[in-house]
Amino acid sequence: MRVRVDVCWTQHIFLFFVFGLSFMSFALSLDGDDYSKTGNPKALVSVTNLIYTRLQNLKTVLKADVDRDLGYCIKNLKGDWNEAFNFDKNLDFLSNCVKKNDGDLTLRLCSAAEIKFYFSSFVRRDEATTVHVKPNINCNLAKWVSGCEPGWSCNADDEKRFDLNNGKILPSRTRKCQPCCEGFFCPQGLACMIPCPLGAYCPLAKLNKTTGFCEPYNYQIPPGKLNHTCGSADSWVDAESSGDMFCSPGSYCPTTIRKVTCSSGHYCRQGSTSQKPCFKLATCNPNTANQNIHAYGAILIASLSLLMIMVYNCSDQVLATREKRQAKSREAAARHAKETTQARERWKTAKGVAKNQKMGLSAQLSQTFSRMKSARKDATPVKASGKSKDKKKEPSNLTKMMKSMEENPSNNEGFNVGTGSKPGKKPQAPKGKQLHTQSQIFKYAYGQIEKEKAMEQNNKNLTFSGVISMATDTEMRTRPVIEVAFKDLTLTLKGKHKHILRSVTGKIMPGRVSAVMGPSGAGKTTFLSALAGKATGCTRTGLILINGRNDSINSYKKITGFVPQDDVVHGNLTVEENLRFSARCRLSAYMSKADKVLIIERVIESLGLQHVRDSLVGTIEKRGISGGQRKRVNVGVEMVMEPSLLILDEPTTGLDSASSQLLLRALRREALEGVNICMVVHQPSYTMYKMFDDMIILAKGGLTVYHGSVKKIEEYFADIGITVPDRVNPPDHYIDILEGIVKPDGDITIEQLPVRWMLHNGYPVPHDMLKFCDGLPSSSTGSAQEDSTHNSFSNDLWQDVKTNVEITKDQLQHNYSNSHDNSNRVTPTVGRQYRYFVGRVGKQRLREARLQALDFLILLVAGACLGTLAKVNDETIDTLGYTYTIIAVSLLCKISALRSFSVDKLQYWRESAAGISSLAHFMAKDTMDHLNTIMKPLVYLSMFYFFNNPRSSFEDNYIVLVCLVYCVTGMAYIFAILYSPSAAQLLSVLVPVVMTLIANQDKESMVLKYLGSFCYPKWTLEAFVLSNAQRYSGVWVVTRCSSLSQNGYDLSDWILCLIVLVLMGLICRFIAYFCMVTFQKK
């Protein structure tokens, strides 16, 4: 941060150089006697012009000193000089003063030493804001001439030795003391004159006998001096201390000695040199200080609202039209495929009937005794047959197509459902990559589905892959096979040393549906999490082998599907949109669009979701599809990516029997294609029970009771003395026994069931479970002795801390684990996934238009309130009003930005665990939030700016607010990712207030000054003040320098402030992305 000199000292330096050096030229050129001796008006004009010309040449002399000492508040010396001392239009005040002083004007002007002494006195300032000059050679306790009074001045005593260039020695002044000229100001205690700047009104004061003040200034004539009268202005400092010198609001001062009231249709701010015309829709009466431009705010907000409504309606209409066209094309394709399939079936039936008739006729002819009789009998049927054949040929195109298919199954030219082309045009069915239009793609997809259905009916013993292969007549894409074997798998909670899964051995195989059952607390979900590589916070022992190799399951993440127990899907997307997004991001990047559509349509068909495919899934606040349909969508999200291993955590929970069977049939179709399916179920119905291939039953404590084929489960339990009563569902009976509701038959106990299974398969029995083996005495249990020692509280606390650190470390290692990819599947790149995410987030935002409109409405109200209440304060360059703006905009924009990442955390965790790009997810959300970054400053300023009407331009304010919103949005991302919604909202309210308070604290404290540099309100407020300060010139230049010096600002730092805000926003986004990846729960 730039180190500033004292506030007042800075002002002194500025005015010292401006006026001190300027009056050096007066001494070198002015000779007032030329006019006083002759009284010639031409001489007066020459003298006046000569003085003014010398004054204008000082810009070159002053440049180096101003750049060195006042560079923080004066960047354009020429421009600021002209704004303050360009008297080209009227030099009357100078001519009048030359005439009044009879040639001794030069002797009455302040020398360089006096100007320096005057401004150095500002270090001490009285509480009543009256400027006091320190005692000097002319004005002190022992000597006080009348020229020392405010508004008065005296001639220098020694005319010959008087030198305005002398900056060290104060000249003695005792002669010809009189009131100062109008257009000049004469400080109390100095006895010399300085010209007033443009924008000031410096007439001769008039005594108000009632108050005793010399109006319009705030000083009185000395008591007891009857001959003393009021003089001119007495000081020029900032607006707060010398506001009576400034041209009053509602008037303008073309010269420093003339004030004109603003006319109707114009407005004049304080310190104006000319009146400014009001805008057409603004109302400006005479003597108006600021124009009322509320109408333009209303027009702007109406335009923005209309634009947003148009964009929303048009985009919504485009989406609706696109969806309708898609649905129409899809329905037409489905109808076409069904009609074609039905026509094929009718042709097959007719052909079969004809063959049967021909075979019957041949048998009848073989039994005839007379050749003539047989000939007569044969003639009539042949004729009838010919007629029948002619009738069947009437629908010639369809008949030929069906006949061609039956005679040559390998030729698909007669059944080209993909394009609907006529027979004979193409010798081969079009593949997915050759299809481009939506109509062609849907015809291809539905044609394949209908053929698969027909093939499945005719070849019930064939696998689903075989059916697809026959239906497509192409080489079927084979999925990689995943077999998962586990040996002595044990999971132990860290810190508690409690087994949640113990000594589980077995395997789940491709092409089979394995069900995991057990009572509550048996570790079913933990078992699935261990298989899926998601178990953290525990110690794992034993082996998990993938296809016989000790590989991590994460190496097959791209072809592994995991369906969580909760329905983690996007409620503001339709069923089809949820499935389509998963398919796009997780299927092979080289797969054609038509094949992806075919896979999606297969899943929708198999899960029975056709009639709700275009319905929103729904959320807690907004109801959508039913719970059973939502559960099927939850499963379908994983099915569309064609997994080789599909793990489901209680997919049938909450479903009725029909929905459960529909879901399980869909899963069996996947298993027929070679998918390894493992799922947790709770007491399935007998029908569902028979649909499983393998069953894994766990007891409490994570011990295996049974793991094998469903066909052999009853036989096994019967062998150990557990038989299922009549009319009782076997799974229900086994669970009741494990829960302790039903006592098992015979002498066997629940604790012995896992040991019996281990002994049955020859697995080693843990030492502490040997007591449950049959025939062993209770004394030989070998159980470990209980630890009778008790740790102290501090030891327990330390152990808990260590455990939490280990669990956190384990979670971080899990999140950043990078296993070698063995799936042989190349998913879309980050760039392509980013496009998919942008499309998805765009749809979600359009469906949340009411929330967006509410955000804008709140911003409008805030802008109107703050614009009305926080009036422009020229004395402080409106610092306070901008402070309120920073707090309000930061708070409102942060709270609304929380929704970007706090609403769909669970969905992100699921997608990230499935291998979908986190970077694409984050960048797409941030990209769509840029619409708010652009629009919200416009919405707020449409009220605030036109109600407040500051001096700075609308464009400057908008740029600063855009950078501010970009910065605080990044901070909101961090809060949304790390904290719960309620905590994040509290932080979004607290942080702007605290940071603003820190940024506005006294800069003398180095700690607060250092902390303030890291607070975005400090840089935002500086940018606002600088954009406003640039508009203060002329008489305001000292106020500008004073305000910037007090706050430690520099005019050249405006761009720097914007860059810092943008950098803070970028850094916050990097931190937010890091937190999102690091602290996610996979």
From Swiss-Prot:
It is found in: Membrane. Residues 484-726 form the ABC transporter domain. One of its GO terms (molecular function) is ATP hydrolysis activity. It comes from the Eukaryota. ATP binds at G518, P519, S520, G521, A522, G523, K524, T525. Residues 329-348 have a biased composition (Basic and acidic residues). This is Putative white-brown complex homolog protein 30. It comes from Arabidopsis thaliana. The lineage of its organism: Eukaryota, Viridiplantae, Streptophyta, Embryophyta, Tracheophyta.
